[in-house]
């Protein structure tokens, strides 16, 4: 299944991140400093597949297929990595060495866009279409996955917002192919 094989990333190459030394980036770093570092919240939403599986269980989605999230993560990863390498934005911890963060294995790639935000919103939208009665809970999980990356200080707000846009665009692409 290659749902994103022909996904056009060119519009997302044009959506540049804020300049590293600019006002917006400094403002975003200051915003990160104000967010309490909550490791249990970060851990709860770091594993995207587990977060959606828990939401499905909590909302009694009987026919939930956990392989859907795994497939969407696998399919979206190469697209996300291309954009991360293209934009090559440093992580907040790289621009502000005094910024405490919750170091995770997933923080090895450039910052923009947030891959967790992309995948959270892609999966949230896909599952919401499949399970419309649980849409509110599924999209809340997507939002928490995205926000957890800022709580960990792994991403700037603009990384998360770009990730959310990209995830929604990927979902629309997949839906239009059906």
Question: What annotation goes with each model-predicted range?
Answer:
Residues 144-175:
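Interfacial helix-loop-helix junctions of multi-pass membrane proteins
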Residues 1-152:
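Hydrophobic alpha-helical bundle signature of multipass membrane enzymes
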């Amino acid at each position: 299944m290659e749902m994103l094989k022909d996904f056009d990333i060119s519009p997302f190459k044009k959506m540049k991140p804020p300049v590293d030394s600019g006002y917006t980036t400094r403002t975003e770093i200051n915003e990160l400093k104000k967010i309490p570092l909550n490791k249990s919240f970060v851990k709860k939403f770091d594993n995207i597949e587990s977060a959606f599986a828990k939401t499905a269980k909590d909302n009694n989605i009987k026919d939930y297929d956990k392989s859907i999230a795994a497939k969407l993560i696998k399919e979206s990863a190469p697209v996300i990595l291309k954009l991360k390498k293209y934009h090559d934005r440093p992580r907040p911890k790289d621009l502000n060495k005094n910024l405490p963060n919750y170091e995770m294995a997933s923080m090895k790639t450039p910052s923009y866009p947030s891959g967790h935000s992309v995948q959270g919103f892609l999966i949230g939208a896909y599952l919401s279409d499949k399970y419309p009665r649980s849409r509110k809970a599924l999209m809340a999980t997507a939002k928490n996955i995205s926000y957890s990356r800022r709580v960990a200080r792994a991403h700037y707000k603009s990384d998360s917002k770009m990730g959310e846009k990209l995830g929604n665009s990927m979902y629309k692409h997949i839906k239009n192919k059906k």
